[in-house]
UniProtKB/Swiss-Prot annotation:
Gene3D superfamilies xref list: Ubiquitin Conjugating Enzyme
Knocked-out gene: effects: Impairs hyphal growth, conidiation, conidial germination, and sexual reproduction. Leads to a defect in pathogenicity and production of the mycotoxin deoxynivalenol (DON). Displays lipid droplet accumulation. Shows reduced tolerance towards oxidative stress. Leads to down-regulation of protein expression levels related to protein biosynthesis, fatty acid metabolism, cell wall synthesis, and oxidation-reduction reactions.
Gene Ontology terms for molecular function: ATP binding; ubiquitin conjugating enzyme activity
Pfam families, per the entry: UQ_con
EC number from the UniProt entry: 2.3.2.23
Descriptive protein name: Ubiquitin-conjugating enzyme E2 PEX4
Organism: Gibberella zeae (strain ATCC MYA-4620 / CBS 123657 / FGSC 9075 / NRRL 31084 / PH-1) (Wheat head blight fungus)
Pathway(s) this gene product operates in, as recorded in its UniProt entry: Protein modification; protein ubiquitination
Length: 172
């Protein structure tokens, strides 16, 4: 086996061990977690593809009635590299691309360290909903509303979007 293949296999084993520990942590903390309804692998046999279902209860900014499915792709080099997270359910937010669900959050890019877990990333993404960063928008229209000071208009837009059946995850 070439060295690069053995390094990849070792990294993947290391990632799997870490993810199993993170799943154990989630199973202990799940009952107290109000904003994350579900977190874990999509299929039992693949630890590298996860999903989370998050809700907007208590976030404010119009997101309280929202419920979203988030895809989490974990690289074989995890925890040295961050997971890639995208919203599957459409969402209106300055830091989330409406077209593809891409999330702009430093924690998932340059600010990543192996000290973070997938659960902490999901919590951070959920927190981002209530604390938008208009300096690095992926949805420039919503960011422009906020920058212009139209907080009420933005909240009403988000509320309308969260109540639309096509923009609310209705699965398990």
């Amino acid at each position: 086996m070439p060295p690069s293949s053995s390094n990849t296999a070792a990294a993947s084993r290391s990632a799997s061990k870490r993810l199993i520990k993170e799943l154990e942590t989630w199973s202990r903390e799940q009952k107290e977690e109000k904003g994350i309804e579900r977190l874990g692998p999509v299929n039992e046999g693949d630890l590298m593809e996860w999903e989370a279902v998050i809700n907007g209860r208590g976030i404010g900014q119009g997101y309280d009635e929202g419920r979203w499915l988030v895809n989490i792709s974990i690289p074989s080099t995890y925890p040295l590299a961050p997971p890639k997270m995208t919203f599957v359910t459409p969402i209106v937010h300055p830091n989330i691309a409406l077209q593809n669900g891409e999330i702009c959050l430093d924690l998932l890019k340059d600010a990543w360290t192996p000290a973070y877990s997938v659960l902490e990333c999901v919590r951070a993404v959920r927190m981002l909903l209530g604390c938008p960063e208009t300096d690095s928008p992926l949805n420039v229209d919503v960011a422009a509303l906020l920058r212009s000071g139209d907080v009420l208009g933005t909240r009403k837009l988000v509320e309308l979007w969260c109540q639309d059946s096509d923009s609310r995850y209705e699965g398990p």
